[in-house]
Amino acid sequence: DGGSASEVFELTVSPVNDAPILTEIGDQVTDEDIDFDIELSASDVDIDENDQSLTYSASSSDESLVLVSTETLGDGGTGTLTLDVQDDRNGSAEVTVTVSDSQGRTLDSETFTLTVTAVNDSPILTEIGDQVTNEDEDFSIVITGTDVDVETDGQSLVFSAVSNDESLVMVSTTSGDSTGSGVLTFDVQDNQNGVVSIAVTIIDSDGGSASEVFELTVSPVNDAPILTEI
């Protein structure tokens, strides 16, 4: 018979906060002692509709290796991740970056691996200072140096020395072990006096080096006369 009836009603779709989506970062590699920044970005369908903003945060699994901090740039979903690599440290750490919206109830996070590659650090030669001795008197002094790589990389340290006037003073060195100590010996030539420059160098197993130049003053000493045989 084709009889019918109809009714119109309204369906209200309530808004639900959507989680932001963090753009993939990927694993990172850097050399020891080098800090760097990574640009962060994320998207959120609610930003334009609900006037939301995004905030970044980050954490490191090993703060003795790398410290992390973030800065949010405006409301457009961009930011900066700063990786502060600690001095003379190498290895790997897991870094977790999180982005949250202004409602604070939804977030997205990503974890990546930061690998810090070891770099040879040059040794440091302990200051020696100028020296004074008398004519005809040989002597020795202890010389020392340090190297942050000695314990971690099993490095050894070797000393060498050069005199700019071997007619006045000749020099030689004896290197110790990996503790970075040695002996510098001065062979003062007979009946000679004056001032000579001595250059001392410390070298590690990977070729890193440090040098210092100092002066040795040889003071004259009165020599007794020699009577010719009669």
Q: What are the residue ranges of the model-derived segments?
A:
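Short, solvent-exposed loop/turn segments at the edges of extracellular beta-sandwich modules
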Residues: 1-3, 100-106, 202-208
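Extracellular ectodomain surface segments
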Residues: 3-5, 9, 18-64, 86, ...
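Short, solvent-exposed loop/turn segments enriched in Ser/Thr/Gly
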Residues: 34-40, 77-79, 90-96, 137-143, ...
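Acidic surface patches and DE-rich sequence motifs
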Residues: 60, 74, 101, 163, ...
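Strand-loop-strand motifs at the edges of beta-sheets in extracellular beta-sandwich domains
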Residues: 63-86, 95-96, 167-189, 198-199
